[in-house]
Amino acid sequence: MAKISKRINKIHEGVDRNKLYDLSAAIGLVKERAVAKFDETVEIAMNLGVDPRHADQMVRGVVNLPNGTGRTVRVAVFARGDKAEEAKKAGADIVGAEELFEIVNGGKIEFDRCIATPDMMPLVGRLGKVLGPRGMMPNPKVGTVTTDVAAAVAASKGGAVEFRVEKAGIIHAGIGKVSFDNAKLEENIKAFADAVIKAKPSAAKGEYVKRVSISSTMGVGVKVDPSTVKVVD
């Protein structure tokens, strides 16, 4: 118990919960307080001035992080014939059509990202109740419904991150690992923030980006001055 208390104290030590840190300082604090015995993910949370209950205020998109995410992404592709072969050659972990549908429909999800060719969507659409809640339903808006399956697989493996605002108006995403250089984390964070800003719906009024914070998997959240992540309304 004493060890746990000591670890918690170390995580919170030196972090002012009411202060807005510039991005560089915030990254340093997060890395210094990552004391878990594994390479923790660095996560960002952005509170947005939108009400996602209204369809015209939904914020979603995809961004290719310049330095990747640091994690191994397992990719499934729904495709037939030549497109299935293209997906396999590009490094997709699972490729199939009706047989893959049966596996997924049975609740066996052994992938992190799902891609489909347009002709497969009548079949894949029937998996909405399985893939939808997990945020894995292929969507042309984020490049996961496409005829260029090779490029989609490469992007998914290379650092493509999907984002979608939650009910409370918050967007969460993993943008790297604690082992990354500070500069690489900063580049990833700025790329992610820029993508979220560009996805601002026209129906959003007033302040768009209200708060930004970063943390590690097991660490404390550090508030970031939005202006230092190039957040401008």
UniProtKB/Swiss-Prot annotation:
Pfam families: Ribosomal_L1. GO terms for cellular component: cytosolic large ribosomal subunit. GO terms for biological process: regulation of translation; translation. GO terms for molecular function: rRNA binding; structural constituent of ribosome; tRNA binding. InterPro entries: Ribosom_uL1_bac-type (IPR005878), Ribosomal_uL1 (IPR002143), Ribosomal_uL1-like (IPR023674), Ribosomal_uL1/biogenesis (IPR028364), Ribosomal_uL1_3-a/b-sand (IPR016095), Ribosomal_uL1_CS (IPR023673). The keyword tRNA-binding applies. The keyword Lyase does not apply. CDD domains: Ribosomal_L1. Signal peptide: none annotated. Keywords: Repressor, Ribonucleoprotein, Ribosomal protein, RNA-binding, rRNA-binding, Translation regulation, tRNA-binding. Belongs to the universal ribosomal protein uL1 family. Part of the 50S ribosomal subunit. Binds directly to 23S rRNA. The L1 stalk is quite mobile in the ribosome, and is involved in E site tRNA release. Protein L1 is also a translational repressor protein, it controls the translation of the L11 operon by binding to its mRNA. This is Large ribosomal subunit protein uL1. The gene is rplA.
